[in-house]
Amino acid sequence: MKFFDHALETMPPKAIKELQIEKFHSLFKNIYGQNRFYTEKFDAARIDHKTIQNVNDIAQIPLTNKEELIKAQEEKPPFGSNATFPESAYSRFHQTSGTTGKPLRVLDTPESWEWWGRCGGFVLT
């Protein structure tokens, strides 16, 4: 059997859950207080770094839909309040086609672009 990332893809279930929580806490730390869109969303749901202690707790986080993101972009053009870093940290910009309404604009950092590439690697392996 071929693997794109053998260590990750063969990790025991308990280790996967621990990694998921570790990654969530890292993401939360980077977003909360920096990204106005998600800070307001977490505050409204009373979610903080202590709320999520295991993967089951993630269900408490409110989902985000495209309409919310487009509304944020209309209120604060062109990218809305869903930016975590200064504009200079972003290396790419793309947008959806807008076939279901208005196009959604998305900024990528070099790290997020690399993540998308890794997703492709998992799919193609």
Residue ranges with predicted function:
Residues 1-95, 101-123:
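Nucleotide 5′-phosphate-binding alpha/beta core
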